[in-house]
Amino acid sequence: MGKFFSDSEWTYAPCTYVSENTFVGREPEDAPLPTYEDARDRLPKPVWEGHYDAIACYDKAWQIAFGNLRRPTPGSGFVSNFIDTAFNGCTFMWDSSFILMFGKYGSRVFNFQNTLNNFYSHQHVDGFISREIEEDDGSEKFTRFDPSATGPNVMPWCEWEYYLNIGDRLRIAEIFPPLLAYHKWLHDNHTWQDGTYWTSGLGCG
């Protein structure tokens, strides 16, 4: 499979909302990553008498999560520290969004939500965002018109759930332009004539 990069294709109809995307071209974060050992006492603790195996499983999930934190590779276009999908050296839109559904509960220690920043920073000028991006060089696994290239659009749901828990209005203002541009791209390129959306089996995850 070939490698593709943001805005490397020949023909684009630029989306005006992308010009308001502050993640594109941002300097990468340069902060150390926390370890599970440093974080464990600041993570939520379940209280469930007699279910020690379940609590041990819960603790192990956090240990695995902190073991998969990564920093942006120089030149990759990644802008934020993030949690790795731990599959094939790529970060995935769907996997990341669902990981962040539990990651938000560890936000006092690490801002897991910033993982999605690395998708916004790779937005094309027409609003497209790839669902699978190489972590080492920022290349994308699909051209933007491949039926499996992106979507369905789960990132706004993930961001809204984060807002309901954290109440970060500044983040809502920051993510709105790239999400609106991405929504518009999906509306223009992944809908049938009756207005319903389409994707492929592979594109669903």
For the regions a language model picked out, list residue spans one by one.
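Low-complexity, Ser/Thr/Pro/Gly-enriched N-terminal "stalk/linker" regions
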Residues: 1-91, 114
